[in-house]
Curated annotation (Swiss-Prot):
Organism: Prochlorococcus marinus (strain MIT 9211)
Protein name, per record: Glutamate-1-semialdehyde 2,1-aminomutase
Pathway annotation: Porphyrin-containing compound metabolism; protoporphyrin-IX biosynthesis; 5-aminolevulinate from L-glutamyl-tRNA(Glu): step 2/2; Porphyrin-containing compound metabolism; chlorophyll biosynthesis
Modification type N6-(pyridoxal phosphate)lysine: residues: K271
Transmembrane intervals: none
Keywords of this entry: Chlorophyll biosynthesis, Cytoplasm, Isomerase, Porphyrin biosynthesis, Pyridoxal phosphate
Amino acid sequence: MTNAFNTNLSQAVFNAAQDLMPGGVSSPVRAFKSVNGDPIVFDRVKGPYAWDLDGNRFIDYVGSWGPAICGHSHPEVIAALQEALEKGTSFGAPCELENKLAGMVIEAVPSVEMVRFVNSGTEACMAVLRLMRAFTGRDKLIKFEGCYHGHADMFLVKAGSGVATLGLPDSPGVPRSTTSNTLTAPYNDLEAVKALFAENPDAISGVILEPIVGNAGFIPPEPGFLEGLRELTKENGSLLVFDEVMTGFRISYGGAQERFGVTPDLTTMGKVIGGGLPVGAYGGRKEIMSMVAPAGPMYQAGTLSGNPLAMTAGIKTLELLKQEGTYERLESLSQRLINGICESAKKAGIPITGSFISGMFGFYLCEGPVRNFQEAKQTNAELFGKLHRAMLEKGIYLAPSAFEAGFTSLAHSNDDIETTIKAFEASFSEIV
């Protein structure tokens, strides 16, 4: 594919977009700045593949940043959406589909006894922070360096995702007063969390984290870390919140909390539960969720929340994921892929460390292990940029950032994985 690789139409559309939208994109990481390139403009997606405007086909490991766990445009999801479209695109009123998806989430996720649907992961995290404060009567929050909880002001402190990709310390426009109650600790460091509790007695509403960090690359929790946080929050009368926007229904049907056997008080979700349509949700113990309006005094609302199309896509996606062998297959695909990537890099003499859990994986171009964001920043981002371009030319679409997780889907075949590993072998040899 390298000799015929042509992105003229993508380039033309992106050039025009820069006069119409800030940076030419609707979300910063899509601009390819951290890989020193120009973005590929997609025309259509199907299964594990994406096609750009120039007709290039890519094996896709971004999966719309996580939602496409069953593959893009799954025929059963599309059929369900076509039927739902006939009934309308938005009601602005209760619909029965909300009940069905809510019931499926409550049945699956250990921490969730009640759930509220919103339109994005950012919305879910904003609302859950307000709820934490309302329930505990405390203002302070502990988050972890490199964890990303959306672009709300109070979370843009040592954040991951696009903030990490662009190397931004924080964001202009966020008042110091807004983030003064946001405390940070290194991921996988229980002692740092203990110190924050000791320094702020009876002041911390809760601890929020990605149970697997996917917005600073891929950093799994060390044994005992999540369990330790659960114990610390209980001891201090604080809440534990898992941001499972990325890991929910991807790591296992019940999310990371089911996989690791640690149950938080509250959980935020998104991505997979919308089946590719905009959605978010937050849920938890009934005692806490009963504070949300109109049942309780904590206000949160949304015009398009519980949108019937998003509910439809989410229901069908979760039905597909409940089928036997789903997560075993995702685990097998990710294991073969990450093992092949690491072996290929080592053959080329390139330092690498990589890991995976279920349908989620990541690697860093440095010596491992990587246990936190500071260690993640040791990755060779410049070399990753060269790798990204080389892989594009071979028909492989990776996240355009050294600080984002990758995703396998049920649509990826063993042949797709082998093709990808061969592309890595060739690309590592080219860039060394």
